[in-house]
Amino acid sequence: VTLEGFRPSSYLTSETARLQETVGNGKAIAAVSGGVDSTVAALVAKRALGERLLPVFIDTGFLRAGEPENVKARLGDPSLGLKVKLVKAGGRFLEATKGEAMAEEKRKKFRETFYQVLGEEARKDGCDFVVQGTIAPDWIETQGGIKTQHNILEQVGIDSLSKYGFRVVEPMSELYKDQVRVLGRHLDLPKDMSERQPFPGPGLLVRCIGTVSKKKLDLLKSSTMIVEEKLGPFNYDQYFAGVIENKFAKEPVYKNLDETAAGALGLPSSETRVDVFEDRVTGVKGETRSYGRVA
């Protein structure tokens, strides 16, 4: 479905019917984060299931300062009507990812902990289904090996029912971000929410380069607040802060790096020095994943 051919009213009608058929007389949890994808998915599910939908927000500890409480209040506004259950699990996520420096492994450990917590909440509330805001780029990036998106399970062979005790329902798994925003506006989602800048599911965990610690997280939360406050008014597509250890590789990593940088900057090589950090970051070259050091 192209953006030009996307009809939010028709899509909403078909997905509402599909959700009702899938869940039947049962109950479902909606995993919400405050982002546009999970919020729109929850609103679609709310139309289909009414009071049989329980929105759950997991505080992973990797969120912006004050975000859990802000999201709960915002989604609970009468205009949206999503009564969110807030689950505090920051210590558990920090312990699960402690000592891990590799970005992909951090994402996988986050995913495992996230769904363990969701499964526990589903059992507590008698829910057999979890509704989440997976969109097409999530499973495309995961299957393509670019990076593991934490909300991808069945597309990579993980049976959520046998492993976590619930079935996943994804009402927007074939949509792209622009289409989700159109659907959000159709559902009267406020503009600051429908147009909100993407924030990764694992949150600041993946912007904390290398191993994660409370000290680095606290610094990243304060830095994120400053960056978003200063750059927000310019409406850039994306901007964010990251934290990396101030440790550099002891041996040369790339040949002639100083000369290359000098040429790019138009400076004499005698006046140019390039240091390369020890920790590695994830990037994309062309359409393939790249994992390397930062200079």
Tell what function each PLM region has.
Residues 1-295:
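ATP/NTP-dependent adenylation/nucleotidyl-transfer catalytic domains that generate, transfer
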